[in-house]
């Protein structure tokens, strides 16, 4: 078997702004592909329109930048036409969840074997700073000078609502964490949704500051691993317990609480109730969940299409 390095997947000179989160993600994608070990020509990277959607230009794979919001549709066609191809769909929060929102939920619902990467910086960057479907209520932008009056989408809710079987989250500045979820997405057979939290240094700088730096992630984020207790903090001194139908943060050692009392993460549970609660956690009361939150098996559209009986049989 031929061994590949990140360099084998690189192409061209990225033209994003210095410090843009896209640089971090691109490097992680190159590294993940090398570790996965599939040849460049066994991969296709397909995007829509936006800053992050320039990514195919920097991939030494089959690559295509398509039209606004249609990355999922084109990716579906590529995967159905060639099931042996590994397809990476790249979308920003505006491209993927506004004009491309319907394509997004139906690709997830159909469980097409796509690696669906959502680069979420909570802003329209290419068009110079309008609020996006993931911008928080009250967000001030060029298109909302007095603050938005809308509640944002939570990508996890859309994925779970479309009966998604895989959802993971990483921070672009955390290369090991990003590579880990990309490899897990590749290993999963079906629609794999990965939300990547990243910064836009020009129009929404600092939007994910609470988890952007390693020293802050220890206290503001929790890395979920299947089969392991849900612990976080600089010394894993905090954990998650169930309280009624919800969750609560506890400190080990207080009120007799030990590690045995902490919930164990089950990414493979078919019932997504607890997984969704984890995915929706936000600061300051809860840590932001990172890692593979849901990963369950189900037949894929592209497989069933070729194995189901047809009227001609």
Task: List the model feature ranges, each with a label.
Residues 165-217:
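ATP/pyrophosphate-binding catalytic subdomain of soluble kinases
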Residues 1-125, 179:
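Thiamine diphosphate
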Residues 306-313:
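Conserved small/polar residues in nucleotide/adenosyl-binding loops
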Residues 132-185:
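Conserved thiamine diphosphate
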Residues 196-289:
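Internal helical hairpin/lid segments
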Residues 49-51, 121-123, 174, 197-202, ...:
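Glycine-rich beta-alpha junction loops
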Residues 12, 39-43, 81-87, 109-115, ...:
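Short coil/turn connectors at secondary-structure junctions
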């Amino acid at each position: 078997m031929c061994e590949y390095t990140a360099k084998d997947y690189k192409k061209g000179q990225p033209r994003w702004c210095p410090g843009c989160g896209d640089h971090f993600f691109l490097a992680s994608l190159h590294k993940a592909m090398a570790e996965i070990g599939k040849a460049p020509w066994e991969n296709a990277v397909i995007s829509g329109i936006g800053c992050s959607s320039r990514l195919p230009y920097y991939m030494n794979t089959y690559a295509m930048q398509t039209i606004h919001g249609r990355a999922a549709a084109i990716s579906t066609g590529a995967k159905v036409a060639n099931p042996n191809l590994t397809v990476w769909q790249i979308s920003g929060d505006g491209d993927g969840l506004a004009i491309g929102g319907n394509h997004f939920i139906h690709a997830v619902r159909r469980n097409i074997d796509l690696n669906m990467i959502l680069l979420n910086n909570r802003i329209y960057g290419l068009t110079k700073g309008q609020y996006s479907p993931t911008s928080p209520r009250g967000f001030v932008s060029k298109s909302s000078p007095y603050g938005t009056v809308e509640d944002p989408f939570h990508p996890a809710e859309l994925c779970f609502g479309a009966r998604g079987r895989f959802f993971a989250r990483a921070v672009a500045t955390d290369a090991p964490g990003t590579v880990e979820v990309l490899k897990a997405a590749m290993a999963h057979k079906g629609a794999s949704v990965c939300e990547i939290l990243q910064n836009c240094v020009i129009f929404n700088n600092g939007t994910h500051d609470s988890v952007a730096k390693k020293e802050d992630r220890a206290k503001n984020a929790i890395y979920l691993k299947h089969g392991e207790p849900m612990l976080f903090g600089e010394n894993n001194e905090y954990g998650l317990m169930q309280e009624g139908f919800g969750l609560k943060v506890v400190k080990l050692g207080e009120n007799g609480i030990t590690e045995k009392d902490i919930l164990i993460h089950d990414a493979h549970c078919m019932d997504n109730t607890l997984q969704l609660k984890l995915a929706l956690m936000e600061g300051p009361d809860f840590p932001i969940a990172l890692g593979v939150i849901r990963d369950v098996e189900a037949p894929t559209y592209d497989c069933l299409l070729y194995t189901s009986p047809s009227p001609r049989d």
